[in-house]
Amino acid sequence: MSAGDVHVTGGPASAPADDAAYEDSEQGYAAGLRAWDGLPGIPASSGALIRDSRGRILVLKPTYKSGWTIPGGVMEANGETPWEACQREVFEETGLRVSAGRLAAVDTRPAKARRAMGLRFLFDCGVVTDEQAASITLQSTELSDHAFLAPSEALARLRPAVSRRVAAVLETGGCRYLEDGRPVAGVPDE
């Protein structure tokens, strides 16, 4: 290393040379907790893009807010991953079990008055059979209706931020990084 170069490791100057071993040690774990303690949390949620055999998108009508949305919801603070949240929410809301999905987008929702910044993960969970589509059982405390709609009709019915997110994914088919549902200059698609 030449003068002016900096090498940052996961622990203090007295940490072992093996960063992974340090992070797994009690000392490293405690140091990690102290480093994160007091930092603000960022709310995160996961959603599922689910289609039927005719390419129509599954949309849901919530009882607790206006407009339509896609299956999904908030990640639990118990260590749940975005994919686990997607699977859990789809099952809770529709009775469908999704076992495969592709990360389609990560969307940063900007902070607004009385609302913190948030992260939204969108997974493309593929196509359900006609039998699976017919078996959907809605979570009645949160949802009043569902429909499979042609993409253009689904985009028109979805809440604006969700519509932008889904449209961005449908546009490229790759994984997208978005901010408020919009592509970001300088961040190429997958």
Regions found by a protein language model. Give the residues of each.
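Conserved beta-strand and immediately adjacent loop positions that scaffold enzyme active sites
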Residues: G47, R56, D145
